[in-house]
Amino acid sequence: MRCDRCARDTIHPIESRALDRSRILFLLCCYKRRPRFRFHVHQWWWWVAMEVPELVKLAFARVQRVEPEHVGKIFGVMLLREPDEDELVQLAYGPEATLLAKIEDTKAALTVIYARCSAAAAHGPPGGGGVGVGGGGGYHQQPQQLFSRPPVPACGGVRHHYSPAAAAAAAFGYQVQSPQYWPDSPPAPPTKAAQQEFAPPGLVVDASAEGPYPLRGGQHVLDDNNFGGGYYYPAGEDAFPNGGGGGGGSPARARRSNGLSTRRPCHYFSKGICKNGQNCHYSHHQVYQDALAGAAINGDVYNHQPGGVTPGSLETLEMEITELLNSRRGQPVSIASLPTLYGEKYGKGLQADGYLTESQRHGKAGYSLTRLLSRLNKIRVIERPHGQHSVVLAEDAAKYMDFRGGGGGGGGDTGSVPASSHQIYLTFPAESTFAEDDVANYFGQYGPVRDVRIPCQERRMFGFVSFQSPETVSTILMRRNPHFICGSRVLVKPYREKSKCVDRTCVDNIKSMVPYCPPRFFEFDQELYTAEYDASRLMRKQLAEKREMLLEMERRRATVRRLESMPPQFAYFDCSIEDASPLHSLQDDSKQLDLMNPSLASPDPLEIVSNSQAPPTQAGNIYDDHESNQIELLPESPFAASAPAGNSISTII
């Protein structure tokens, strides 16, 4: 017949039977996989009438000589794999062994397709139509369109499944049932009779082979990790190595067919430091289920308690953390670093259902893990000097809670003296080289040092020193800045408690998490920080008032001494500097005052030690540091040194 649009001679497949099925399969493959072949209908049938390449003809003839009964199925799968020109040359002119190996691989793929399609047909809806086509070979024929997806119903809650492997199997000439819905339970493995019924003659199915779907000769093409629920088609992936026949996507998309989560496990959650919680893009469910499965294997009791852990797992966790703390000689371990140390020691993640472990001073909530650890009997949760929560053995908790008030670990009064009165804040250059021991030795001159902490950073510029007695802190703050430790200039400032910031930041973050997180994420005691914050605020207020009182008293003493020592002739300042030369008399008076007040004239031995460690260019320079806080600096005596000649009379004042 002649096409009216393209004015070319075309051959309709219904009117002419000259085209065999292998050529039609090859054309269908090209039509599906190659966009450039998607012409109009009249152009499509005109392309069908074209001659198939000679290589395909020769390869088809060789396969037909070996497998005359199933040449259409075998050669169709070969063409669906989209062989390039070299592979076609191997099929057409290669050795006989290569051809036989290709045919055997194709038979194995066909066996898998038959087995999978039989399992899918067993779960098809009643009256579901087949998708088989065109005829011959005694197989059922139905005039349905190839590669057509099942219609989507009006309800949006039912997902439909389409398997290109099943459509390709239907194109090979047999009837399969197309599943119209996702079943609630995975299908049962096909029986040997069903496999033999769908398998072509000459293909032997080994029923004694292991696995849910045995294959020919015990060769396992299916992998239990690659499919689930009876709806993953590895044969389709094998037939389409470029991803064209395995459901149009990766194995992860194919695994989505059975309803399981395709998200990968969260690496940070397995280590206990995932900050995204339920909003994480990765899966937390699989990691937690693995932990529960391991607990069941070890004989743990499976009675769930609030917090997502079991009593048996709590005992195991307590024993492991106790062993970890004993290996560190009882030193406190911060909750932020506990999961990392736990993973390094035991090779598994320290995890409870949905907790966070970031430090509260960074504005992250870590209540769930803190509450979990507080349930352990042999471990106490304490609050360290600068706002971090740490875990310590119960027998060692008293050493760290005597001035902190318990910190939530039990024991002690929450209204005791805050840490701000026991420690100081240090600032120093980034190029300093001294260690924590050097800082402890230097400040040990003022009083017993409890702890020195310098954060491990690439450019360290601050640190904290805590003392046994608050009087030591007051003594150091009354000294003049700077201090010199190993030649480095160190400034000392009072440590300010950040309990108020902790309360506000944590509560604000918890409130912001309300629309996104379940209620168990913000189960915490708001009274944990209230009493401590009130006590620290009162102590800071008292300390500031005491400091202001001392400064005011010192100013008054200095003013009285200056007025009493001033000669009568200089009581009035209406004379000029040239007429009255008070400098000589002022020097004599200052010498007399130095003899009367040896505490003002003689230098402090601690100050001598500090200046002796300073560099040569700085040891002799006594100056005020504008960077330091002006509150804790005592005023200098106006008679400590004589003023140079030529100064104004304001020097005396």
Curated annotation (Swiss-Prot):
Domain of life: Eukaryota
Pfam families: OST-HTH (PF12872), PABC_AtC3H46 (PF23182), RRM_1 (PF00076), zf-CCCH (PF00642)
InterPro entries linked to this entry: AtC3H46-like_PABC-like, AtC3H46-like_RRM, Nucleotide-bd_a/b_plait_sf, OST-HTH/LOTUS_dom, RBD_domain_sf, RRM_dom, Znf_CCCH, Znf_CCCH_sf
Zinc-finger keyword on record: yes
Segments forming domain RRM: 422-497
Keyword Secreted: no
Bias type Polar residues, positions: 609-620
GO molecular function, a single term: DNA binding
Gene3D superfamilies: 3.30.70.330, Pneumovirus matrix protein 2 (M2), zinc-binding domain (1.20.120.1350)
Coiled coil: 537-565
Annotated HTH OST-type domain residues: 313-396
PROSITE patterns: HTH_OST (PS51644), RRM (PS50102), ZF_C3H1 (PS50103)
Zinc finger (C3H1-type): 260-287
Region Disordered, residue ranges: 242-261, 598-623
SUPFAM superfamilies linked: CCCH zinc finger (SSF90229), RNA-binding domain, RBD (SSF54928)
Alphabetical keyword list: Coiled coil, DNA-binding, Metal-binding, RNA-binding, Zinc, Zinc-finger
Protein name: Zinc finger CCCH domain-containing protein 54
Species, as recorded: Oryza sativa subsp. japonica
